[in-house]
A protein has these predicted regions:
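N-terminal first-folded block
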Residues: 1-35
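A generic structural signal for short beta-strands and their flanking turns/coil linkers
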Residues: 17-19, 39-43, 75-79
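Solvent-exposed beta-strand sheet faces enriched in polar/charged residues
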Residues: 22-24, 46-48, 82-84
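A generic structural motif
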Residues: 51-53
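C-terminal structural segments of small proteins and small subunits
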Residues: 55-88
Length: 88
């Protein structure tokens, strides 16, 4: 079963307490998709935090994936990530 957007937001806030975070549930765009059939969600997240300063895009995404690793792939099937520093 997929997490609610609010549950995903809270999980990300635990790992990135100083970040501005938005979560969008895109699961409805994927009806009939193999991952959606199992109940796992499709989400788009944006995080803006100074913690990402000096990090490559790959490293930024890895930090976000690490925060939800135990939810993938059974609760989250797809996660689109924008991880930026303030002022970008």
């Amino acid at each position: 079963m997929k997490p609610t957007p609010e549950a995903l937001l809270q999980r990300l806030k635990q790992h990135f307490p100083d970040a501005h975070i938005t979560v969008q549930d895109d699961s409805h765009h994927h009806r009939g998709h193999a991952g959606a059939a199992g109940g796992a969600g499709h989400f788009a997240v944006t995080l803006v935090s100074p913690v990402f300063a000096g990090l490559s895009t790959v490293r930024r995404h890895r930090l976000v994936y690490d925060a939800v690793a135990d939810w993938m792939p059974h609760r989250i099937h797809a996660l689109s990530i924008r991880a930026e520093v303030p002022g970008n």
